[in-house]
């Protein structure tokens, strides 16, 4: 099975890149499943129901989120019914949505888990305290389990990779918008990368206009960030796995628009 995971979609340029390229990529790369982190789709922070439906219609099979999950107030009611969108599982259970979902891709089931790190993030349970139960629940449905670890600290993501080595098909880091060079298959057949990168404008400061971002640092004053527009790319990882859920290959993915 060939699974493409696309990293943080940033603003309108990232959404347009998915909308304009994913259908052809699915055909040209012979993809069976596409999972997209849509955490920054709405002007760089959060996701709206309209944008979620647009990304799914463009060819995404499942969307993951992160620390900006509640930035758009209309997303809460949507998450109650949206079975193909997951929010961090280690948030309070009483909040809308789910942190684990199982999607059907043809005749194959794929489980998708979303986790949120602790360092510099909104309050949440430790992702390590909930993930074992989630993995067990996923395995009752399918051996193919993809885990999106949305976290700032590289140590948290690396540790989760080792914690799930041999138990998840892939442990894929998101959030920093900078693709790391450590893509590999861990012992036991778990594809891993510390950060899968960003789908959006790379002539930017991690997606935002450079001049606005620079004013935040040079003036030390809050600035309302706006998505940049230049050098738009789709970034992520391409995972190949067998029916047993073990990854046999993984490679970093980058496609310029």
Task: Give residue ranges: language-model regions.
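Acidic, metal/ion-coordinating pockets
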Residues: 1-257
């Amino acid at each position: 099975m060939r699974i493409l995971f696309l990293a943080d979609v940033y603003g309108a340029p990232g959404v347009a890149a998915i909308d304009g390229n994913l259908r052809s990529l699915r055909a040209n790369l012979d993809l069976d499943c596409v999972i997209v982190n849509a955490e920054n789709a709405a002007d760089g922070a959060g996701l709206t129901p309209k944008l979620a439906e647009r990304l799914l219609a463009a060819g995404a099979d499942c969307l993951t989120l992160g620390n900006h999950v509640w930035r758009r107030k209309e997303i809460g009611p949507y998450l109650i019914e949206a079975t193909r969108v997951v929010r961090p599982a280690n948030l309070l259970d009483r909040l809308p949505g789910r942190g684990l979902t199982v999607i059907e891709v043809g005749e194959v089931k794929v489980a998708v888990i979303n986790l949120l790190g602790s360092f510099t993030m909104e309050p949440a349970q430790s992702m390590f305290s909930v993930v074992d139960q989630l993995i067990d629940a996923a395995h009752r449905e399918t051996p193919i389990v993809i885990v999106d670890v949305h976290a700032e600290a590289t140590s948290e993501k690396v540790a989760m990779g080792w914690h799930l080595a041999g138990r998840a098909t892939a442990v894929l880091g998101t959030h920093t918008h900078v693709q790391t060079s450590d893509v590999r298959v861990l012992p036991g057949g778990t594809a891993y990368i510390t950060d899968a990168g960003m789908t959006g404008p790379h002539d930017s400061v991690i997606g935002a206009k450079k001049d606005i971002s620079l004013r935040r640092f040079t003036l030390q004053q809050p600035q309302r960030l706006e998505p940049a527009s230049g050098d738009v790319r789709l970034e992520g990882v391409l995972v190949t796995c067998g029916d047993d859920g073990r990854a046999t290959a993984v490679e970093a993915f980058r496609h310029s628009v």
